[in-house]
Each structure stands twice: as C-alpha cells, then as structure tokens.
Regions:
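Positively charged n-region of N-terminal signal peptides that target proteins for export
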Residues: 1-4
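Bacterial N-terminal signal peptides
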Residues: 8-18
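Disulfide-stabilized extracellular recognition modules
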Residues: 24-26, 110-162
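A short alpha-helix/helix-coil micro-patch that ends at or immediately precedes a cysteine
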Residues: 26-77
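Surface-exposed patches in mature extracellular/periplasmic domains of secreted proteins
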Residues: 52-66, 79-90, 127-141
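Short, surface-exposed glycine/acidic/tryptophan-bearing loops
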Residues: 66-111
Length: 162
C-alpha cells in the first residue's frame, strides 16, 4: 500500500488459502536462477500496465529487490502474510525516496505474472499502487515454498519507491 511521511501501512489480503494439512515452511526457491524469470516477468507485466496508462516504466532497484526478497523469505519461513514493519524494512535496506508502496500476493503452485497483476488491478488499493505516477522504482521477489497449508505456493512481494 502507499505510504507517505510516517509510512503508515495497512495490509490487504489478496488471496485466501483454504485450510489444509500443515507442511514445512522452508522455501523451495528463495532467489537466483529459479526465481529470476518470474521476477522479470512480473516487472514486465507491471510495466505493460503502466505503459497502457501512459505512465513511466518502473526501473529495477537493487535495494528494493533485496527488501522484497528478504520479506518474502521471512513470510515463508515464519508462515505469515502481512506487510509487517514496512518503514523499518525500507530503512534497513537503505531505500531512499519520498513515496513508498508495497503489494503482496500469494497463491497455490506457481503464480503467473499476468494473473498476479490482474488480481492487483481488480483490487482498488493495489491498482492505486500500480498506477501511481510518483512511483519510479521497483523490486520484486517471487519465491516458491510451503505456505498456507500447501506444499508449493508462490509468495509475491513487490516494493516500490518514488
């Protein structure tokens, strides 16, 4: 969600999991070659939407990428789905800017970039983030691991700064 000043954050749960037997929360893929194509596809899908709305393309930022990767991994390992202390995370990863935002998503199996962006566009708070012209940088993480009672789930963190 979008944050200014004190960086107040609220969570919007995008996907709801159906109860299932508990499984290990250890991520199957945290980073590297396995998640790089998913990350690239997600950024491309977000930028396609921004282009269609005559907005500037988001540029990948290493600090935002590290923050997103850290948060997705933490949610997988500790089995929670929330923005957490977003302001502290931006500070910890030396993310600079006037405006910050974050979209989260998770789903069973491997989530496609287009499906993720379609869900965000259907949610007014997430749509606002995607179409915010003041946001200029992005970092994403799309690890796959046990989550929400499923042996295989994708947990998406997209962090933005302007």
């Amino acid at each position: 969600m979008r944050c200014r000043g004190a960086l107040s954050v609220f969570a919007v749960v995008l996907f709801v999991a159906v109860a299932a037997p508990e499984v290990s929360a250890r991520p199957l893929t945290e980073r590297g070659a396995a998640s790089a194509p998913r990350n690239t596809a997600l950024i491309a899908a977000v930028n396609t939407v921004r282009t269609a709305h005559l907005l500037p393309l988001l540029q990948v930022n290493a600090n935002l990428s590290r923050a997103a990767r850290s948060h997705s991994r933490d949610m997988l390992v500790h089995a929670y789905f929330a923005h957490g202390n977003f302001a502290l995370r931006m500070s910890r990863f030396a993310v600079r800017g006037r405006v910050f935002a974050e979209n989260l998503a998770w789903g069973r199996g491997v989530m496609s970039a287009n499906a993720t962006v379609a869900h965000w566009l259907a949610s007014p708070p997430h749509r606002t983030v995607l179409l915010d012209p003041s946001l200029r940088r992005i970092g994403v993480a799309t690890p796959i691991g046990a989550f929400g009672g499923f042996a295989r789930a994708t947990l998406v963190t997209a962090d933005f700064a302007g």
